[in-house]
């Protein structure tokens, strides 16, 4: 969530950097919303069919692609692709953020697990705003920031792929 929060808070910086009209990103949020809602509906089916453990490594691939779009593209219409891709990742994240924990640890302590993960999520959004602000204050371009975020996402996806097999679901006793 920290990347999306940083992008949302500093959307005027993005627009200015890309020489887009002021309202391009706010208008593109409609695509974000639609992509997020469609993904929310479809990801439940995908979790039931494939399991969260198999899907979680690909959850942030659209976010990685959004950073590639932000890095390379200057055209205003790319804002719609950029936010649409973020919406897809956020839609997956909303479903996988709950179902993964239930799959791995069961539901007995799901309330405590969700409380802890939600606290981390809230902290990460605050951290994202600070990180983006520090980078912008230190003259990082939006392309530099997109590269840093993309690298972080790529490392995260790689770690998930490496460790995914070690997180076996719990066996329920009858």
Across the structure, where does each feature detected by a protein language model lie?
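A late C-terminal transmembrane helix in Major Facilitator Superfamily
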Residues: 107-139
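Extracytoplasmic gate region of multi-pass secondary transporters
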Residues: 1-40
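A membrane-interface helix-boundary motif in multi-pass transporters
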Residues: 134-152
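Helix-loop junctions at membrane interfaces in 12-TM secondary transporters
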Residues: 72-82
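Helix-to-loop junctions at the C-terminal end of transmembrane segments
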Residues: 39-51, 136-137
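Structural signature of the two symmetry-related core transmembrane helices
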Residues: 54-69
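Intracellular juxtamembrane helix-capping segments at the cytosolic ends
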Residues: 92-105
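Multi-pass alpha-helical transporter architecture, strongest
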Residues: 147-174
């Amino acid at each position: 969530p920290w990347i999306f929060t940083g992008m949302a808070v500093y959307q005027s910086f993005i627009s200015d950097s890309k020489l887009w009209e002021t309202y391009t990103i706010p208008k593109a949020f409609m695509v974000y919303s639609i992509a997020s809602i469609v993904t929310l509906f479809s990801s439940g089916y995908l979790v039931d069919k494939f399991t969260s453990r198999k899907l979680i490594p690909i959850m942030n691939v659209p976010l990685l692609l959004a950073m590639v779009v932000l890095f390379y593209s200057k055209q205003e219409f790319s804002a719609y692709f950029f936010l649409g891709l973020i919406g897809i990742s956020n839609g997956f994240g909303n479903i996988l953020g709950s179902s993964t924990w239930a799959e791995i640890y069961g539901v007995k302590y799901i309330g405590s697990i969700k409380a802890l993960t939600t606290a981390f999520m809230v902290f990460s959004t605050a951290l994202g705003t600070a990180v983006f602000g520090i980078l912008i204050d230190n003259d990082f371009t939006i392309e530099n920031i997109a590269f840093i975020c993309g690298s972080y996402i790529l490392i995260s996806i790689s770690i998930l792929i490496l460790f995914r097999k070690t997180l076996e679901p719990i066996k329920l006793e009858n």
